[in-house]
Amino acid sequence: MENYQEQATKFLKDTNTRFKVKYFDYAYYFPQDKEQREIYKVTLKTPKGSYTFKFGQSISNQGQEPTPYDVLACLTKYEVGNFEQFCSEFGYDTDSRTAERTFKSVVKEWENISRIYTAEQITLLQEIN
């Protein structure tokens, strides 16, 4: 796991990204959650701009602040495509309102990532998984 953390820390340094995590709430995060989890507000700030979003910590990591690796590994790193492609790729029903909300959230995340990072930096981000 140490290698993963080092990779994420190196990415932040190489891209001049400030990483900030702040506790936000203890609640249900995903629509299908059966257990509550810690929710944090995460800010990624680069020379191109900043992006603040909520991050639901893994239930198995309760009491631990998310690390850069925890967050960066979960980010959308590729263009999403259209709704039908998204549903086909991830097994969603195209008639599902939940799928549509999820799709819109993923598109918004991708738009923010591609706004604050260059194409070259996104290629580096894609290596964190």
Explain the meaning of each model-derived region:
Residues 23-125:
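Acidic, low-complexity, intrinsically disordered interaction modules
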Residues 2-27:
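Negatively charged, low-complexity tracts enriched in Asp/Glu with abundant Ser/Thr
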